[in-house]
């Protein structure tokens, strides 16, 4: 491997190095030789020359070759490019004619600027910074594209959600109508229950009036019972008096009978003990026995009549009293039965009143619960409607914010697109200027894949293309493309390593 280095100055106070290198890879395949010699002369230099050559040779018996050369000179500049390469392979190398350019033997007056390296380093740093910014802009564009896709997805989602919410409005309308119908049914039930309650209250008032009437009748019956009891007591007292009178009369009659018998006995004894001869001068003969018998008969008749009258009167009174007692007992029994019936009716009415009160309380509780449920349902429906309206308003606000953000993102994207287009135009202009300022570029394409990076010069690849880029003599970059490419290599100071273990060193 051999290296040669030359220095040229592309402008006032600026120098740039160009090198020549060759690399040979032992891989069998196509041969790739690249030789480039860019030069740009400026009016402020005298006798400024530049030379650069680079060849990459593969020991393959045959392979495609491509050479590109370019030259651009100013008022007092010149350049010269030289490249030679041979086909390498297992056969002996061919001997080629060597030509010598005598102008190369003359000493060069390069007028090297000591600040060229610093300026070159600054240019490299600026290019790196611009590349970093460009990569950041590319990442930002990709991120904004992702955000754009996300916002579009959200937009579609919110549009579909809006449609769903608009479809929910008739559902809520139907739900509200159903609640309204339920409220109307509850109101109708409330009216019906109120009518039933009024009917029950009227029936209860009727039962109450009947109860009051029955209570009044009971009080009247009790008063009559008291009066009858007084009459019965009076009759019982009279009966007792009459019984006492009867006993007294019986005792008196027995006493009189005993008295009469005693008197008769005394008279008989007196008559028997006294023998009186009475001679009366009368024309009639008085028979005392007949008189006594007659008086006795009269007395017995009067006593029997009195006894019969007393007994008949007593029997009559007893019968009357018994009839009165039976009548009053029957009346009392009927009154008791009526009182019992009234008590049973009162109990039944009391139970019915209690049931009516319980039913009324239940109906009032049901009506109150139905009203509360209706009010709660209406309040819930109103709350849900308010929440849905708030959610709809919030969704609209979010949609407006998202639209605003989307507009800002689109504006940022447009600005970035403009910046990218500006950078693209700048890059295209630099490439055009590089194409105008290149002296000679020779490119040999092989089937191997790789990349070369040297200082500000980058040799990169993509599938099917070969790219060589680097700073131009005008301060830009140069890019060369070929139909085939090799895998990229990472830069290491002033050397690089290819994926096929091939290295190129620039002095």
UniProtKB/Swiss-Prot annotation:
Ubl conjugation in keyword set: yes
InterPro entries membership: IF_conserved, IF_rod_dom, Keratin_2_head, Keratin_II
Span list, region Tail: 431-507
Region entry Head, spans: 1-123
Domain of life assignment: Eukaryota
One Pfam family it belongs to: Filament
GO cellular component terms listed in the entry, alphabetical order: keratin filament
Region (Coil 2): 287-430
Region described as Coil 1A: spans on this chain: 124-158
Record key words, sorted: Coiled coil, Intermediate filament, Isopeptide bond, Keratin, Ubl conjugation
Domain IF rod: 123-434
Keyword set includes Coiled coil: yes
Region annotation Linker 1: where it falls in the sequence: 159-168
Coiled coil spans: none
Region (Linker 12): 270-286
UniProt cross-link Glycyl lysine isopeptide (Lys-Gly) (interchain with G-Cter in SUMO1), position: 229
Coil 1B: region residues: 169-269
Record-annotated disulphide pairs: none
Subunit description: Heterotetramer of two type I and two type II keratins.
Note: There are two types of hair/microfibrillar keratin, I (acidic) and II (neutral to basic).
Protein family per UniProt: Belongs to the intermediate filament family.
Protein name: Keratin, type II cuticular Hb5
Protein's organism: Mus musculus
């Amino acid at each position: 491997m051999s290296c040669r280095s030359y220095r040229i100055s592309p402008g006032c106070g600026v120098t740039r190095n160009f090198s020549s290198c060759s690399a040979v890879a032992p891989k069998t395949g196509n041969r790739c030789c690249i030789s480039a010699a860019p030069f740009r002369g400026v009016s402020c230099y005298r006798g400024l020359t530049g030379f650069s050559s680079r060849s990459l040779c593969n020991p393959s018996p045959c392979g495609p070759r491509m050479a590109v050369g370019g030259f651009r000179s100013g008022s007092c500049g010149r350049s010269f490019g030289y490249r030679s390469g041979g086909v390498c392979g297992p056969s002996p190398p061919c001997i080629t004619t060597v030509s010598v350019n005598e102008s190369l033997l003359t000493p060069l007056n390069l007028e090297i600027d000591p600040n060229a390296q610093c300026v070159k380093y600054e240019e490299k740093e600026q290019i790196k910074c611009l590349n970093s910014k460009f990569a950041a802009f590319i990442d930002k564009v990709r991120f904004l594209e992702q955000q754009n896709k996300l916002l579009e997805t959200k937009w579609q989602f919110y549009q579909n959600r809006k449609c769903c919410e608009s479809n929910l409005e008739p559902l809520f309308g139907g739900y509200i109508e159903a609640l309204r119908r339920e409220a109307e049914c509850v109101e109708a039930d409330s009216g019906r229950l109120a009518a039933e309650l009024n009917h029950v209250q009227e029936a209860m008032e009727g039962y109450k009036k009947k109860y009051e009437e029955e209570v009044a009748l009971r009080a009247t019956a009790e008063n009559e019972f008291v009066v009858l009891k007084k009459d019965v007591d009076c009759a019982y007292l009279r009966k007792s008096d009459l019984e006492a009178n009867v006993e007294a009369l019986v005792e008196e009659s027995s006493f009189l009978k005993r008295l009469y018998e005693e008197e008769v006995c005394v008279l008989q004894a007196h008559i028997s003990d006294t023998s009186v001869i009475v001679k009366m001068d009368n024309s009639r003969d008085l028979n005392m026995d007949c008189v006594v018998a007659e008086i006795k008969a009269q007395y017995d008749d009067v006593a029997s009549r009195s006894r019969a009258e007393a007994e008949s009167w007593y029997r009559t009174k007893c019968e009357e009293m018994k009839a009165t007692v039976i009548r009053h007992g029957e009346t009392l029994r009927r009154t008791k039965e009526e009182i019992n019936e009234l008590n049973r009716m009162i109990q039944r009415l009391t139970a019915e009143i209690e049931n009516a009160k319980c039913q009324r309380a239940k109906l009032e509780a049901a009506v109150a619960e139905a009203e509360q449920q209706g009010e709660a349902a209406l309040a819930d429906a109103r709350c849900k409607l308010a929440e849905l309206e708030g959610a709809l308003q919030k969704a609209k606000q979010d949609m407006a914010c998202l639209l605003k953000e989307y507009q800002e993102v689109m504006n940022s994207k447009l600005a970035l697109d403009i910046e990218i287009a500006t950078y693209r135009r700048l890059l295209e202009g630099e490439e055009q200027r590089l194409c105008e300022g290149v002296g000679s570029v020779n490119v040999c394409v092989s089937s191997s894949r790789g990349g070369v990076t040297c200082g500000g010069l980058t040799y990169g690849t993509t599938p099917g293309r070969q790219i060589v880029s680097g700073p131009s003599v005008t301060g830009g970059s140069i890019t060369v493309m070929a139909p085939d490419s090799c895998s990229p290599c990472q830069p290491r100071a002033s050397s690089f390593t290819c994926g096929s273990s091939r290295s190129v060193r620039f002095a």
